[in-house]
């Protein structure tokens, strides 16, 4: 049964909003063009995004035919160049850390085919319009092509300023493009996904989230077609991958810490994060008191509900995630913020940008051969002092002693 929201979320400056009291629950996995039979869903909506600066929409680059038939479209610390990280072994590796003992994964040598799916949604003409998301995709496309050898014809670009209806980031087009990204992927292929737009949270229905909420992203037609849940994205893009396939993911949106439901989360020191209910309880209590003082009764209620769910099933949810959401492939994701945080737009190099997208490209331009953990640290250094968000690193497997370079250069 579907639930309608009681009220839209409050306005905000960022790419998402606090957890709503009720939201349209995840739909069964369906990869056919929308709409299905029946009435469209109801949703809570991302908040209006207030910006004080103009941002002209960039002109897409010339069209090159692709297999998917899409047109193409400072506060930084002084660091010395990181030492070149070691290459990982190519043989199958054991998971450990609570995963089944017989289950193994394999790193990618990144010597095969390269594909990229880049999604930027400004929500043009909608109350929650953003400014920098299309710019993010334009810059990421150029960066991948010039620095890492991704061919234009092997990129699918979805932005809401295009004329071709297949290139608009609707829910149906996004799901179909995600399928295209991973279709027939072979060991040592390099796949890349970048999403810049609104994100949010919805009550978890399958028990795999420690905090009781799934992360979601919002297509341009979310008011009609609905959001896309992390479980669905995992099922499309992670579960089908074979051992040795690399999938690198960038989610520049709010509440995106576990947007692909990857079970292993790392800190800047490389230590696998474990749930700390005692610490989170204190934080939740402080959040509840702060919300009450601001008159935000819904914030009090959601904080209390979230903590009760954590206390009741946090540990079991993590075990369930490790048992069911690992992958024999080589999947790594950088997200713009923790599950409970919002992500900001910024104004850099004369244009509106997403903070994570900007810091990701800037860090790799300065130091191309970084490990995942080095890159996480350098991204945070770029953002430190400007934004409260803390980008996250999560993986489909434990990183172990071997640390792969964040993105491999062409062979």
UniProtKB/Swiss-Prot annotation:
UniProt GO MF annotations: cysteine-type endopeptidase activity
Record GO biological process: apoptotic process; proteolysis
Keyword Transcription regulation: no
SUPFAM superfamilies: Caspase-like
Source organism, top-level taxon: Eukaryota
Family from the record: Belongs to the peptidase C14B family.
The name this protein goes by in its record: Metacaspase-1B
Gene: casB
